[in-house]
Regions:
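Secretory targeting signatures
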Residues: 1-27, 264
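A short beta-strand motif characteristic of beta-propeller blades
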Residues: 33-44, 88-99, 141-148, 197-204, ...
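Beta-strand-rich domains and repeat architectures in extracellular enzymes and scaffolds
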Residues: 39-71
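Beta-propeller blade termini
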Residues: 50-58, 105-113, 154-161, 212-219, ...
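Acidic/hydrophobic-patterned starts of short beta strands in beta-sheet-rich repeat architectures
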Residues: 60-69, 115-124, 163-172, 221-229, ...
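Short glycine/acidic-enriched loop and turn motifs that connect beta-strands
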Residues: 72-74, 126-130, 174-180, 234-235, ...
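WD40 beta-propeller blade core
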Residues: 76, 128-130, 187, 236, ...
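Blade-level signature of beta-propeller repeat domains, shared across WD40, Kelch, NHL, RCC1
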Residues: 357-398
């Protein structure tokens, strides 16, 4: 175990920011702002970053926490305080060797990396894993392979990508600014009981691509998970070949005239029990692909004229707690769409703004109902916009 622990942030830091604890605005159809925090207007430190799995039980106490990241060398662990009816920062995770090393977590995730039935927190910086032990988050493992080889790691997620019943830590990224880097678009690590070991990768033989965010799920309905990633204007489904220990790629789409997709989500958005593939673009645009038995035709495609880039601000989940999943996508304002058996129709919008790098659905306040976490990575500073993180809650009319 590396003897580096989390660093507490005092209340003085929170006093330097605007923390709105209760609902002050209502968007369409019953969604209220449960909480928001305005970080400031400095893009070097205040911009918010995405993590595909930021809501979960990170300290194994039976209650969920919310992770918030950004360009400030910090992952904030937020916990709902029922008495004060607000989210409070209970811990702050720093990169290894901080303050001698300054870097930001482009992605973070909560899940069982070590396959012992307890959750850890994973972060992209140095491919680091934290475990909550004795009232602190301790670094139990890291693997600097990506950084050592002049690569970048934009995001990470935890799940079983080789279908052996055990989780891996999946890093998306690539060569970064170093075109001669050996770092792959997808790099997979596994906890071997002592440390994180690099066990597999997907390196495109034709291009040096960069994957901002990958998705994981059973998108071809064969009972096994696939990784979906997008780079260099193409979308790839990666099937693990267990016999040859390699990923087998299938290109499902070419994004002509579009910047490569930023966000990728593999979840059931039409409520038929099977995962679809959702992509978000600079556009601002999202597309949805659905397996038909032989391929992945496009099920849905929408662009919001005049909207801001969606970036990684896309997720699927039961946002209004009606038993059916919705699609949430941030294109300046955040759009909430639901399948009506023929297409996706807009149910509501949320009053967000800027380039949305964060849109995640989960139970943040531990009441058994989902909330929507949102945050922006770029704003119009000249017009007075601030980098902001929100939590929205659906409150049905009585």
């Amino acid at each position: 175990m590396v003897s580096l622990s989390s660093v507490g942030i005092t209340s003085a830091l929170n006093q330097m920011r605007t923390d709105i604890k209760t609902s002050t605005q209502t968007s369409s159809n019953g969604y209220e702002i449960q909480w928001m925090l305005e970080y400031g207007n400095d893009p070097r430190t205040d911009a918010r970053y995405e993590g595909p799995q930021p809501i979960g039980d990170s300290d194994n106490d039976g209650k969920n926490e919310l992770l918030i990241s950004g360009r400030d060398c910090t992952i904030r662990v937020m916990k709902w305080n029922e008495n004060q009816q607000t989210y409070q920062q209970v811990r702050a995770l720093r990169p290894p060797f901080y303050p001698f090393i300054h870097c930001s977590a482009g992605g973070m995730a909560i899940g069982d990396v070590t396959n012992d039935g307890k959750n850890e927190v994973a972060a992209t910086w140095y491919t680091t894993v934290y475990r909550y032990i004795a009232f602190k988050y301790w670094i139990i493992g890291l693997n600097p392979y990506i950084f050592k080889n002049n690569g970048g790691s934009a995001d990470c997620l935890i799940g079983d990508c080789d279908n052996d019943g055990k989780n891996e830590l999946i890093l998306s990224g690539g060569p970064g600014w170093e075109s001669n880097s050996s770092v792959a678009e997808i790099t997979v690590f596994r906890w071997n009981g002592l440390f994180l070991k690099k066990v597999s990768e997907w390196k495109d033989p034709d291009v040096n691509g960069y994957v901002y965010m990958a998705g994981l799920g059973d998108v071809d309905e064969d009972g096994e998970n696939e990784i979906v990633c997008a780079y260099e204007n193409k979308v790839i489904v990666l099937n693990w070949d267990a016999q040859n220990k390699v990923f087998v790629p299938t290109q499902i789409y070419k994004t002509y005239g579009q910047v490569s997709p930023f966000g990728v989500v593999c979840k059931d958005c039409d409520n038929d029990g099977n995962a679809e593939i959702l992509l978000s673009y600079d556009g601002p645009r999202i597309t949805i692909f659905k397996w038909n038995g032989t391929g992945y035709p496009m099920q849905f495609d929408i662009t919001w004229p005049g909207g801001d880039p969606v970036i990684e601000g896309i997720d699927v989940g039961d946002a209004d707690n009606d038993g059916a999943n919705e699609v949430c996508a941030g294109a300046g304002v955040t759009h909430i769409l639901q399948w009506n058996e023929s297409t996706y129709v807009e149910e509501a919008t949320l009053p967000t703004f800027g380039w949305m790098a964060v849109v995640c659905i989960g139970d943040c306040d531990n009441d058994g109902k989902n909330e929507i976490n949102a945050g922006n990575v770029d704003v119009n500073i000249d017009s007075g916009e601030l980098f902001t993180e929100w939590v929205f809650k659906y409150v049905p009319e009585t």
